[in-house]
Amino acid sequence: MRKKIVAVLCAAAAFLTMSGCKKAPPGTLTGISISYSGMCYDDTYGFSIRNDPVDGCLFSCNYKDDEWVELENIPVEDTHWQEALALAEKLGLESLPDEKKNSPGLFITDETLVSVCLIYKAPDDEIIYRYLDADGNTRSTLRDFFEDLAGQLQTEGKRGDA
């Protein structure tokens, strides 16, 4: 029985390793929510991006009916944040109703961007929401988020390899 358990655990570890996903350590950024209403997980005028705490992948998703609805999955590596930022740009416009869109680009709309919410997982598993002032520099905020997250995951991976 013990050998079967070990075999299953080894297979799961091998799958996660091959998938290119790395688990984010506690206390790091695990998500970002972009909102035009001031609420985290805005269903109507916003979208969310999170780093899944289970398999360590970056999910672009909407939060509806108290659960995440996955739209796309990007393994988080140091070169992937640009790809995720481009996807964030796309989803930022797609998440708005047609009448709210007035030009291409990141969150360019006649609606005022009210909040950028960073989501953290604390070492004690508490979820912490930190709202940033939305000052029109959202692209920079997103870029910094992805760079920081990629750096943290890369550092964690190196610590695990040592």
Regions found by a protein language model. Give the residues of each.
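Short, well-ordered, aromatic-rich surface patches in folded extracellular/luminal domains
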Residues: 22-39, 98-162
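Sec-dependent N-terminal signal peptides
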Residues: 6-12
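N-terminal export/targeting and maturation segments
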Residues: 22-62, 68, 75
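Short amphipathic beta-strand/extended segments with alternating polar/hydrophobic composition
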Residues: 44-50, 70-76, 123-137
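C-terminal motif of bacterial Sec signal peptides marking the signal peptidase cleavage site
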Residues: 17-20
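A short-motif feature that recognizes glycine-rich, charge-decorated loops
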Residues: 60-96
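Positively charged n-region of N-terminal signal peptides that target proteins for export
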Residues: 1-4
